[in-house]
Amino acid sequence: MMTLQNKEENTMNKITRESLMTLEAYHKARPEMRKRAIQERRIRTVALGEHLNLIFENEFLMRYQIQEMLRVEKVFEEEGIQDELDAYNPLVPDGSNFKATMMLEYPNEADRKLALAKLMGIEHKMFVQVEGQPRVYAFANEDLERSTSTKTSAVHFLRFELPQAAKKSLLAGAQMMVGCEHPEYPMHIEHLPDATLASLVQDLS
């Protein structure tokens, strides 16, 4: 059962209506926010081979995405703003986990259809492994099921919930492996780039 303390921890990093900029304020801040978002997304993207990318999301990237959606759709009313918050807040890390958007990318449509059929269940074979700790497998698509009975989806939303020991090891400077165990796409990165690891560790502090 979730305690009050856990509830507070799970909401402390969430984006609130009050913390968002007005459309006018965002218009002025947008060039710098966009520049930072591009840089952070580059640092926080882990490529596993040619066709699989994991984009590890954080509070800033989700805040930027919300502000962009409000700008593009010219949303002013409270209900519309809350809809965007409800859509993107689940991808903000809670302090004990990593949240990632997983993308399977094949330029050729025929290749993509074939691959998505062969890679059924791949979203459940994604893992992170902190140095000296057991592998942590992803919880996938907790909002709704994206795969069908014949193929996986090209986009999945993942949560890697870290045991306390793994979190402590990362905060103490341990390395972390990211990988996929699917028999049709066995791939891993033994050591993350320093900038990527440093950025991910900030999700835990």
Give the role of each language-model region:
Residues M1-M2:
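Methionine residue identity
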Residues E8-K99, E105-S205:
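Long, contiguous binding/interaction regions
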